[in-house]
Amino acid sequence: MFERFTEKAIKVIMLAQEEARRLGHNFVGTEQILLGLVGEGTGIAAQVLKSMNVNLKDARVEVEKIIGRGSGFVAVEIPFTPRAKRVLELSLEEARQLGHNYIGTEHLLMGLVREGEGVAARVLENLAVDVSSIRAEVIQMLGENAEANVSGSNATQARSKTPTLEEFGSNLTQMAIEGGLDPVVGRQKEIERVIQILGRRTKNNPVLIGEPGVGKTAIAEGLAQRIANRDVPSILEDKLVITLDVGLLVAGTKYRGEFEERLKRIMDEIKSADNVILVIDEVHTLIGAGAAEGAIDAANLLKPALARGELQCIGATTLEEYRKHIEKDPALERRFHPVVVGEPSVEETIEILFGLRDRYEKHHQLTMSDGALAAAAKYANQYISDRFLPDKAIDLIDEAGSRVRLLNSQLPPAARELDKELRAVLKTKDEAIRAQKYETAEQYRAREMEIKAQIAAIAQSKKNEPDLNLEDPVVTEDDIAEIVAAWTGIPVTKLTKSESEKLMQMEETLHGRIIGQDEAVIAVSRAIRRARVGLKNPNRPIASFIFSGPTGVGKTELTKALASYFFGSEASMIRLDMSEYMERHTVSKLIGSPPGYVGYSEGGYLTEAVRKKPYTVILFDEIEKAHPDIFNLLLQILEDGRLTDAKGRTIDFKNTLLIMTSNIGSKVIEKGGGSLGFELSEDQTESQYTRVRSLVNEELKQYFRPEFLNRLDEIIVFRQLTKDEVREIAELMLNEVFARIKQQDIQLNVTERFKERLVEEGYNPSYGARPLRRAVMRLLEDSLAEEVLSGKIKAGDSPVVDVTNEGEVKVLLGEKLELLT
């Protein structure tokens, strides 16, 4: 209770305890509270008593006459008498009746008068005070204070009829009159439907149902604005739209029945005022609110009033919460009438952004271009898939405004350096003053003034620049694109010259790591260029390929190279080894376990990875090893760029590049379509590749369903590696070994003879480049490891690896290099 006491009321209680000590009493009674009220001197109670000729001296005399003096021994903690406790309870009740959420001296005085049987009442009678007129005097004085502090508008007078509601809610109508609400654009149909339901005789309670961020609360604000503008039917004129904070209503209810008491008071106030429309955002929070230890929850307390039409309530909640909480309670559900609030279209969102533009321009102190607003709606719809319009578009313009303002408010680099120097000079000057080195301090003072003058000059020159500060900074389409790119990782910004050159030279860049396989490199490069320029189909993935061919020719390596050069790093690639998905039940690993199974809350590996990183390469390695049911899952990804996970969320694959590798047809490729064992001319090689490709396609058709193959953009058959290509790959592998051993400060070289030996042992058309890797490990890495461990090669050496005439690999140092013959 005491937390609601004003400072003056607390002072009265302290003075009452002092009076008890003065008279030697071990209790605080009504008479001590009266003496405290008189002694406080500045509160409303003291002023009222003073106007009735009550002073502290006379009051003390009367109290002493009635109760006398005590024993003299007084405890540290002085308890209240039962009558004094009753006075405190009555003062709380008086405060509530007057609609005050505090207890002041005036309430304590009215509590004393209302109690009427204590020593205080007898003291007042003895002092010839008209006790019956005290309450009227207090209320009159309270009224004068209120008139001095509050303007007497109709809205304020009406609001004072509902003090409890005012404490636990916000008056949207008043905020609309004062211009404190954002303008509501569109939504006329939904607002009309809400007005229609509010006009009913009974069960006049609409509930706004929609996804998060579509503008449910805005509809309630739109209704408040229409009432403020008197643009409503006569049945709703002069109504007050008040939003109730359920959390605040529950907060601080320590004792049983306190929550119910608050809610009943609110309902009584609404019933007596007869002009309140209650708005409860997140209306599902009513269910269970305040229901502790068998108490009745808020929803059950409100049910009778909602059904009889005594309470007009607008609820707002999401589809999921409505289904989970309100539909489970048919008795509550029948009292509400759903108004479905759909997500606005991109065009409607642009109109909403134009309506809100002034508010955001004023807040950020800049200008927002028409193109920026249109881009915000378009990009939000296209690239941010897990949220809803117009909320995500509004967030884009808000953050873009913040970014542009911050960029324009920063000092130039030269001024920032000077500012840093100024702080150092001030610190040194203060140290010199503390050390009483006043001459040194004077020198630093001169430097301080010099730096301040330089900073002022730079700021002035920036202000005088013609194109920068004559007008407010402008938020452009590029700024919106920067924010989208920062949120999602998808490059939406316009192409820079360096990036354009990088994309044009993409094949050359990939060929630095991938030897041969021109068809695959060209197909992947074209897909990336198409997506980056914005010419790809916005409703499909960037591209989808099957890389088919023999083992070890660079199918997975090409995907790694692509992820490394154009998506940040190899780690940014989402890699799924399909040999892990050979059983039917492993489908759940991709999209998440169904409800009731272990791991439901964790989500699927594929869907969660794409939600976190929507712009990436997805590699389905060894696709033919997967269970056939996996391919059914891929159909909607390949066609529509979307997949629904176990929780019902739609995951967007429209900015992913899908690559599947397969060894299907490797037997056909190994046979090479005939002419095996003979050196082929270029024309023969090309015709052989064409024949092999058609045979591989036939094999794929036998293994995969037509609807799966038909959704792929391209099936690329990798060629077998030629001896020259294996030689180039050998150079790459040797360079990797050189780089690794250079970290130990050893400069390694190999002879041409060793390279030829490496190619001879590592070349196998059927197995690609993997035998070469084994040859490097056996011939080079093993020999080097033995020499390093034996101590023959140490840091700083420059060994050379060669092959003797007998075919033995030798690691030679400086003095033995003459053996190289």
Curated annotation (Swiss-Prot):
- InterPro entries for this protein: AAA+_ATPase (IPR003593), ATPase_AAA_core (IPR003959), Clp_ATPase_C (IPR019489), Clp_N_dom_sf (IPR036628), Clp_R_dom (IPR004176), ClpA/B (IPR001270), ClpA/B_CS1 (IPR018368), ClpA/B_CS2 (IPR028299)
Gene3D superfamilies listed in its UniProt record: 1.10.8.60, Clp, N-terminal domain (1.10.1780.10), P-loop containing nucleotide triphosphate hydrolases (3.40.50.300), UVR domain (4.10.860.10)
Clp R domain: which residues? Answer: 2-144
Q: Which SUPFAM superfamilies match?
A: Double Clp-N motif (SSF81923), P-loop containing nucleoside triphosphate hydrolases (SSF52540)
The entry's protein name is ATP-dependent Clp protease ATP-binding subunit ClpA homolog
Species of origin: Porphyra purpurea (Red seaweed)
The terms describing its cellular component in GO are: chloroplast
Molecular function (GO) terms listed? ATP binding; ATP hydrolysis activity
Q: Which SMART domains match?
A: AAA (SM00382), ClpB_D2-small (SM01086)
User: GO annotations under biological process?
Assistant: cellular response to heat
Q: Which UniProt keywords apply?
A: ATP-binding, Chaperone, Chloroplast, Nucleotide-binding, Plastid, Repeat
Query: What segment(s) does the record annotate as region Repeat 1?
Result: 5-70
Residue sites binding ATP per the record:
210-217, 549-556
**Annotated region described as Repeat 2, given as residue ranges:** 80-144
Q: Say what the protein does.
A: May interact with a ClpP-like protease involved in degradation of denatured proteins in the chloroplast.
Subcellular location(s) of the protein: Plastid, Chloroplast
Give one Pfam hit by family name: AAA
Identify its protein family. Answer: Belongs to the ClpA/ClpB family.
